Amino acid sequence: MHTLLLLAALSNQITFTTTQQGDIYTVIPQVTLNEPCVCQVQILSVRDGVGGQSHTQQKQTLSLPANQPIELSRLSVNISSEDSVKIIVTVSDGQSLHLSQQWPPSAQ
């Protein structure tokens, strides 16, 4: 049983830390890997609002250590009640590791 708990704690995962001040959301995607990795990181931001639609994409290759949360970026987004915003983070080593996570968990 303890081995299963330890494995679960060390699982590869992408998480988001989010703070809000008024309509400004600061979103910080973090990745924790159980093996070190030279990975391709892609962050896609899609926004639909009264003023139109915008897409922003960042791609970079990072050397990520194992077993510690690493901040991948820091995005500040002004989101009004009429806006729909989706941020998708993908981390891949091009072989066996492929993680993808969306913020917010279910699109607004």
UniProtKB/Swiss-Prot annotation:
Subcellular localization: Periplasm
Outcome of gene disruption: Cells lacking this gene make aberrant thin aggregative fimbriae (Tafi) which are composed solely of CsgA. Normal Tafi are composed of CsgA and CsgB at a 20:1 ration.
**One biological process GO term for this chain?**
pilus assembly
Signal peptide per UniProt: 1-8
Q: What induces it?
A: Expressed at low levels in agar-grown cells, part of the csgBAC (agfBAC) operon.
Pfam families per the UniProt record, alphabetical? Tafi-CsgC
Keywords assigned by UniProt? Chaperone, Periplasm, Signal
Physiological role: Plays a role in the extracellular assembly of CsgA (also known as AgfA, AC P0A1E7) into thin aggregative fimbriae (Tafi) fibers. Assembly may also require CsgE (AgfE). Tafi are thought to be assembled via an extracellular nucleation-precipitation (ENP) pathway, and possibly also via an intracellular non-CsgC-dependent pathway.
Q: What is this protein called?
A: Curli assembly protein CsgC
Tell me the organism. Answer: Salmonella enteritidis
Give the gene symbol.
csgC
